[in-house]
Amino acid sequence: ALPVVDKDGKYLSLLHYSGFAKGVLTILNPEKRHAISTNIDLIQKTLNAQPIIVSNDSDKNFNATILVGSSSDETFIKRLESHASEDIVVIASDREQIHKICIEHKVKLMITTSGCVISKELRELAEQNGVSVIVSPYPTSPTSMLIAYSMPVSVMGDKEIQTVSMNDTVNKIQKILKDAYCKYLPVVDEENRVIGIVSEH
């Protein structure tokens, strides 16, 4: 388990394996629609992607609706239109028509896969429409899986975990640990700065 802190070292949440695994598995569940909180910079770093066009707000978090451009053009357009009010991230392979559709519909981010670079004409259109474009070195399937790991730890951290004070007794902490589903508790000082972690083991 790892405590998540702000820039002053003050406690925000606890990142633990069960919570992390649950979060990632929920996102990867194909039966459900999910938006993930991330930003373009984090996606680019996670994928080790090449930036082609990146917006000025690339470090700003947003709730990304992830779509894969693998269906027919008509079906894909319908899917885009059904998510029109959302911040859409599209994972596309080397299909130029899908690239054009994404740019014309002004998606937030288009990720081409397997090192595919878009044409000069589409690059100019993407700049005009404010569409960010990055190139993933991976095929479509691994790219789709890896995006889930671009979420910042501030999103994955468990905010329900109770903190304990550096002056709390072992007796008090034992009772808290016994009832807690996560067997780690962050230890904080008077200013809520993390000074350690206590565990049941």
Region locations from a protein language model:
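Internal alpha/beta core interface subdomains
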Residues: 20-28, 105, 116-120
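Non-catalytic interaction/Regulatory regions outside core domains
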Residues: 67-71, 97-104, 108, 112-116, ...
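Short loop/turn microsegments at loop-to-beta-strand junctions
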Residues: 182-183
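Juxtadomain coupling helices with adjacent low-complexity linkers
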Residues: 18-58, 62-65, 130, 135-137
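Short beta->alpha transition motifs characteristic of CBS
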Residues: 3, 10-27, 138, 186, ...
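Bateman/CBS regulatory modules and CBS-like beta-alpha motifs in cytosolic regions of diverse proteins
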Residues: 1-6, 11, 41-52, 63-77, ...
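Short hydrophobic alpha-helical runs that function as membrane-insertion/retention elements
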Residues: 2-3, 89-92, 108-116, 124, ...
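Long, charge-dense
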Residues: 123, 129-157
